[in-house]
């Protein structure tokens, strides 16, 4: 702080960058949260604290902006300082701005690590926060669950709520089970109300 006061300047260390290349697309019934946990499982074996991540490859185009935000959100839990996706048509559509532009890595960019992920191999994942263990959903068949949370920062976007309403439509929550649904923002909540999603949930 004293240096900033004295010189009017501040120095920041440019983080090393991990390049993650995504191939193919996620199978039906597998979602961005599963991919985020899959990536978490890979990165947990590496020291990525203080590093940045860039996502490349044709698989990126299959991910919505909400998907990308979910993946970037969970990456911060491992100490990653930033996650970047290329500016593309999906981003332009999201902002309703055909001429949207962004900053992206040049061809000579140097990376500290290179990771390739075939999205077709990703399957539904569960993160056991108590034991810090990632598991496939199939490993937990038969496990009794008393509470569920859908929402907050990692899974409370409009896409998530639409999916939940589709799954729950015409169904009832089991006796003894509590389900909490928390939209990520007031704007998302209001849009969900307008679409009739909240009534279905």
Please state what every model-predicted region is:
Residues 1-201:
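Fe-S-dependent hydro-lyases/dehydratases of central metabolism
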């Amino acid at each position: 702080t004293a240096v900033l006061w004295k010189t009017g300047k501040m120095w920041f260390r440019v983080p090393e960058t991990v390049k993650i290349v995504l191939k193919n697309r996620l199978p039906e019934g597998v979602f961005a949260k599963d991919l985020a946990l899959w990536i978490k499982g890979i990165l947990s074996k590496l020291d990525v604290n203080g590093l940045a991540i860039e996502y490349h490859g044709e698989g990126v185009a299959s991910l919505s902006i909400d998907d990308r935000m979910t993946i970037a959100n969970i990456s911060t839990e491992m100490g990653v300082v930033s996650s970047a996706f290329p500016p593309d048509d999906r981003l332009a559509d999201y902002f309703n701005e055909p001429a949207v532009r962004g900053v992206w890595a040049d061809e000579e960019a140097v990376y500290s690590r290179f990771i390739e992920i075939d999205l077709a191999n990703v399957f539904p994942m569960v993160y056991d926060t108590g034991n810090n263990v990632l598991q496939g959903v199939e490993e937990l068949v038969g496990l009794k669950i008393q509470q569920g949370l859908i929402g907050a920062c990692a899974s409370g976007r409009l896409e998530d709520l639409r999916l939940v309403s589709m799954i729950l439509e015409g169904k009832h929550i089991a006796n003894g089970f509590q389900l909490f649904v928390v939209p990520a923002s007031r704007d998302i909540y209001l849009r969900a109300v307008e679409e009739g999603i909240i009534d279905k949930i």
